[in-house]
Structures are given as C-alpha cells and as structure tokens.
C-alpha cells in the first residue's frame, strides 16, 4: 500500500541487472577472487556494491557516519544513536535476494511515522539491545543474508562542517549538501570536540582490498567524510589495491553545483587523495576529443547550463528542481591524467532514470577496470 513505500535506490534498474545475469559474461576465477571495498555513503555506494556483487567480486563497504538529516537526524537527536541510514542502504544492497520479503521490509519507509524506515529503527533498536552498533550491523546482515560486510568508518558521533566557495561556514551534513553554492572544503569533529577515531575493521578491509571504489555519490558529504577519518587515507596508501573514483553523473543538490569532473577530482586530491587515484570513471555521451566538452545525455531535459556557475542567486525551489550535468572536456581529461589517473569515459546514463548510472554500463566499465588493474600489476 501507499503507507509502505520502499526506499528508492535504483531498485528497478538493478533488478533488471539481476535478471540478466545468467546471460552476461562472468569474470574468470582469478578475478572473482578479488576483494573490493566501496567507500561512500547511502545513495551512490549501493550502486557500486550491487555492480561488484553481480561480477562475483568479494565486496565490502566503508560508510560515512556524518548523516544528520531525515529519519537518521531524528534518531540521532532524540535517541543519541549512531547514524543508521547510510549503513542500512548498504546492508540492503548486500542482500542475497533483493526481492526477499524481509529485505523489502527492511527498506520500507513509513510516511505516517515521521518518515522513518524499518531498517533505521531496527539498527537503532539493536544497537541498544545488543550493546554496540557493529553487533547491530552483524545481526541485520544475517537477516538479509548479506553477501558482504558493511563497516562504519568511525563509531564516534561526528559532525560535518563545510566552507563554501564564497566563504560561508555551514554546520551539519544536511545543511551542507543543500548549499546554494559549491563547497570548497569539509571537516569532521567528534561531538566532544576531539578528532574522530577510526573503526579498525574498516581500515583492515581497506588495507586488504584489491580494488578500492570511491563513489558514486555526493562528493563532499558522502565520499570525502570517510577520507577525513584519521587512518583511512593511510590505509588506502598501504593497500596494494587499485583505486577507482566513479564520478557522479549530475548534481541534483547544491554541494558541487557547477563543478566539472576535473574539479571533483581536485576536491579529492585536496582532501588527502593526491597520487592515490589510479582510475577515474566519467560519463561522456560521445568520445572525448580535442576541444569537445562532454556532458550528460540528460542536459536537454534538465535545461541545465553547462558553464561553471554559482547558484547563490537561486531560491530554494529552483535549487531543488535543478539538475546540472557534470561536464568534462578533453583538456580536463588530459589535466587529470597528467596527475596520474587513467580517465575512462563512457556513456553511463540509465535511459529510464537519467540521473542514475546504467547498471549494465557500470558493470562493463568495472570489468574493464579489473582487467586493466591486473594487466598493470603483472
């Protein structure tokens, strides 16, 4: 019924991918033995999780813990729990059967109950009943028969702060992600003011990974907050794994409003990832050639202007409706590659949901990255 809504997470697209799996070319045995870790938040990370699982890769996720909006924000404020929302989404993405009734119920959102999801309530209740958030995660992973593990990057209750490109300071993830101008930098602090402590199993998963995937998802409020936890960047550096950054298709919020793909890359390097990114996957409807900027195929339907621009003159209603494709030019591609990464450009847009990655295109791109990684290592 309408009272029980499944939380959206590209469910239909990845159901189609699951149905097509018997007819898709699998990875060889060596590739399926690879360990991958996805670093991100609750919207983009599940996309990479489902894609990697469809390839048979052993997959874990390290998840940002700065969420303070919506259902999670209410639970944090009123029950002082560890933020469950992004972890819940990644657990659901790990489920062996997305159509299992328990897995579907785990994603139900109740509009009549302050928009809480069952999964959020379960994680928060189990954190109290079992005595720890990691134990709550482990119980929920068993309930949905998760095919991998989800690790919070920290167990500390952290607050994200941001500085916009026009110099304003914003406190809170929910505020920062809807900024009216692009963000310049972000930082974390624990609620008692000290630096947050890393969750050691998350660091270990990163160190053991053969492939580390950043994104897709919100750059400053989902991906980078993980990198701000002491020890995470060092774990990436210590890993023998290749690092893939999956750039978002579009900015449908405000935090990266008007930023190009090159500026997304530069934001990562400014937050500790200089020299650590091996591959960058970007959307390009057409092959990148000299002096030919590429944009999302949804530019026409969004009406978005593609030049670098500020949105300080937009009101909230305009900001909410805006969808700005993330563009990349041939010159930007060369500039990125001059700093180390191989840029892989593909048409990645899902025709049915133009602001989502096509699971089939993403799967094919991931296969190629795995092959490239093995070739470079041998």
Report each predicted region and the residues it spans.
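Gly/lys/ser-thr-rich phosphate-binding loops in alpha/beta enzymes
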Residues: 17-85
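Active-site gating loop/helix substructures
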Residues: 156-220
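C-terminal functional extensions of proteins
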Residues: 3-18, 258-378
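Short internal beta-strands
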Residues: 60-66, 241-249, 278-287
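Charged helix-capping and loop-helix junction motifs
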Residues: 226-233, 259-264
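Short glycine/serine/threonine-rich phosphate/pyrophosphate-binding segments
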Residues: 43-49, 221-228
